[in-house]
Regions:
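Targeting/processing segments of secretory and organellar proteins
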Residues: 1-3, 7-8, 28
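N-terminal intrinsically disordered, low-complexity tails enriched in polar/charged
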Residues: 2-5, 15, 40-43
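Intrinsically disordered, low-complexity repeat segments enriched in small/polar residues
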Residues: 5, 21-25, 66
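Small/flexible residues
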Residues: 8-9, 34-35, 181, 276
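Acidic/proline-rich low-complexity IDRs
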Residues: 9-13, 20-22, 42, 201-202
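Short, Lys/Arg-enriched N-terminal segments with co-localized hydrophobic residues
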Residues: 12-35
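Short, Lys/Arg-rich, polar N-terminal cytosolic tail immediately upstream
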Residues: 27-56
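A structural signal for multi-pass alpha-helical bundles of membrane permease subunits
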Residues: 41-43, 55-349
């Protein structure tokens, strides 16, 4: 048969009520749109597994080919190094190798938990990460919402360019500028003095370390982080805005009742990812900014691991600390994912 039919029961499968099917194309569980679209969809069938695999390869082979470099990357740089995690349970000696080193069980974990530094570095890590989530996570969402309300396209592009640029500035340069601005005669103190305040070397005072660190992180990442939310906003149904305007809703009401709910799934996914790395505080900026005066509040798990492992050559101990860090991250990831499912109905898994 080669005559065309229209079936309302199949319309929802293609999302197009004008799609045309051919009965000859439905044999074996396959149906097609008409020749104008040349797109194929599949219905459940009873074909052998080998045949289904072959058909899937024929239709998606280029996707699989493009996926190969990604798989290789994760195998080489993520999964293969996992073999070295075993040294967290051994007294590793380079001359004996991983398998030849003495097994000590949870000794390094016990030493870490009993260390006088444990409470301090854990407190600092949670403080910096918590402040980053509290102030840094909503910042790109707010910027995306504000950019979406700008109707002047040239001005909008200028704002986007200005906010995106800091992401591409080298971290060393940013830290160098911060150190210069925070001097007693630097830019920040000049502004403080202009408003009647007293000057002080800001990076030498521990109470200013967190605001400087978190503020610079927000400044550097707010523009780049807003891109994904702008993309999510672009996917919100425009008919909802038109209906809201007809009902007399203003921009603020549209933002609150249409835009935010429309991007909530994206927000929750990003929140889960952020919570999954709650203890992964970037140590590079901290290493470049902290000093003996701020060491008490700036030392975190990542800098502690760096100091113990690379500077102190305590490879097994630092691996145990890193493994503890990963275990805590997994727990927070699972909790955040469950919370996301309750709030938005979707999660990472």
């Amino acid at each position: 048969m080669n005559f065309s039919v229209r079936r309302s029961s199949l319309h929802y499968l293609l999302g197009d009520e004008k799609s045309t099917f051919k009965l000859s194309d439905m044999c074996g569980g396959v149906f097609r749109r008409d020749k104008m679209t040349k797109k194929k969809s599949y219905l459940p069938d009873n074909k052998p597994f080998g045949t289904r695999v072959k058909e899937d390869w024929m239709h998606n082979k280029w996707k699989y080919i493009m996926l190969v470099p990604v798989v290789i990357y994760f195998i080489v740089f993520s999964y293969k190094p996992m073999y070295g995690v075993i040294i967290a349970f051994k007294n590793y000696r380079p001359n004996k190798g991983i398998m030849g080193s003495e097994w000590v069980g949870f000794l390094h974990f016990k030493n870490f938990f009993q260390s006088p530094d444990f409470v301090r570095i854990l407190r600092n890590t949670f403080s910096i990460s918590g402040l980053g989530i509290l102030f840094g996570f909503p910042a790109p969402i707010l910027l995306a919402l504000l950019l979406n309300e700008i109707r002047n396209e040239p001005f909008k592009r200028v704002v986007q360019t200005i906010t995106y640029l800091p992401h591409f500035v080298a971290l060393v340069i940013i830290c160098g500028l911060l150190k210069t601005f925070c001097l007693s005669d630097g830019l920040f103190n000049t502004i403080i003095q202009a408003f009647g305040g007293t000057t002080t070397p800001l990076l030498q005072d521990s109470k200013y370390f967190y605001p400087i660190l978190i503020g610079s992180d927000i400044w550097q990442g707010i523009g780049w982080g807003s891109i994904i939310y702008l993309a999510a906003i672009a996917g919100v149904d425009q008919e909802q805005y038109e209906a809201a305007r007809i009902d007399g809703a203003g921009r603020l009401a549209q933002m609150w009742y249409i835009t935010l709910p429309g991007i909530m799934t994206t927000v929750m996914v990003m929140f889960v990812l952020r919570m999954g790395g709650i203890l992964n505080v970037g140590y590079e900026k901290i290493l470049l900014l902290y000093n003996p005066a701020t060491y008490e509040v700036a030392d975190v798990i990542s800098t502690y691991t760096y100091r113990m492992g690379l500077q102190g050559a305590q490879w097994s101990f630092s691996t145990a600390v890193g493994l503890f860090n990963s275990a805590v991250n997994i727990v927070f990831l699972l909790v955040a994912n469950k919370f996301s499912k309750k709030v938005s109905g979707s999660g990472l898994f």
